[in-house]
């Protein structure tokens, strides 16, 4: 089946479902994005050897978003095509159309909700979780996310993911590059007057190998820390402090131990900047 027709059919079918029922309590939004850019690369990611030459490339990202919302249910589908100019011929049958986001959320109460599906995540200064919008593909996660958010500024998020490389019948090697086998995280946030405090714990597990004796053995990496921000509209100074500690094991089961301390200070010369 043509992948483009398949995804288009999904969007059209869901749109028909969303439009059923009382219109006054529902909202459907359809929008898109066409983003192109050119890059001149001379030592990008790593120093360029003397025997190699610089490169100039152009890239294109196209997205189609369908968002539905009512008092109890929210949903979003984002189709994405990411390509480099000249990567495929105009008659090529290969395509790069994919599913960037596809999730549904149910509001149990105004404060408590559950979201299931592929979704982009962004927290704090985007150091650990980011949609990576600069990337031509972006980042998203397949997971279940529980949210509890109060009107007083207190927030708690619990996310959990378990990945497989296909529709497997038994535990198999997970060979998706740069991706975890499982992940659980907890994010807490609270506004305290002019201060905003957050805490984050992330536990992700990676298969130690592809053989039968290793696929059931996971190496777990833990990252725990938090952020403290200060901002007062009556003064021109603000800061954002970050602290993280990482421990556990990497995918090759090597021991991990690392620290991060960061402080960002900002002083506004005028209110217009």
Predicted segments, located by residue:
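Internal metal/ion-chelating core segments
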Residues: 154-241
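Short acidic (Asp/Glu) patches
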Residues: 98-99, 128-130, 140
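Membrane-interface loop-to-helix entry segments
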Residues: 139-148, 177-185
């Amino acid at each position: 089946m043509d992948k483009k027709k398949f995804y288009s059919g999904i969007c059209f079918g869901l749109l028909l479902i969303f439009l059923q029922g009382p219109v006054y309590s529902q909202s459907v939004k359809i929008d898109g994005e066409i983003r192109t850019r050119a890059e001149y690369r001379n030592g990008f990611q790593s120093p360029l050897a003397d025997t190699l030459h610089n490169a100039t490339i152009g890239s294109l990202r196209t997205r189609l978003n369908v968002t539905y919302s009512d008092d109890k249910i929210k949903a979003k589908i984002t189709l994405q095509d990411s390509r480099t100019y000249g990567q495929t011929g105009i008659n090529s049958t290969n395509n790069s159309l994919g599913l960037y986001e596809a999730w549904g959320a149910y509001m149990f109460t105004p404060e408590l909700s559950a979201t299931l599906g592929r979704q982009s995540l962004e927290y704090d200064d985007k150091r650990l979780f980011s949609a990576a919008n600069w990337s031509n593909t972006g980042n998203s996660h397949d997971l279940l996310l529980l949210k509890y958010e109060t009107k007083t500024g207190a927030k708690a998020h619990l996310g959990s993911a378990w990945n497989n490389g296909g529709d497997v019948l038994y535990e198999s090697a997970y060979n998706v590059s740069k991706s975890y086998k499982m992940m659980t995280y907890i994010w807490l946030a609270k506004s305290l007057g002019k201060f905003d405090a957050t805490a984050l714990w992330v536990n992700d597990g990676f298969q130690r190998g592809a053989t039968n004796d290793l696929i059931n053995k996971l190496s777990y990496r833990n990252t725990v820390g938090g952020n403290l921000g200060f901002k007062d509209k009556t003064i021109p100074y603000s800061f954002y402090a970050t602290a993280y500690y990482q421990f556990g094991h990497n995918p090759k089961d090597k021991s991990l131990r690392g620290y991060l301390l960061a402080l960002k200070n900002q002083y506004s010369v005028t209110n217009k900047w």
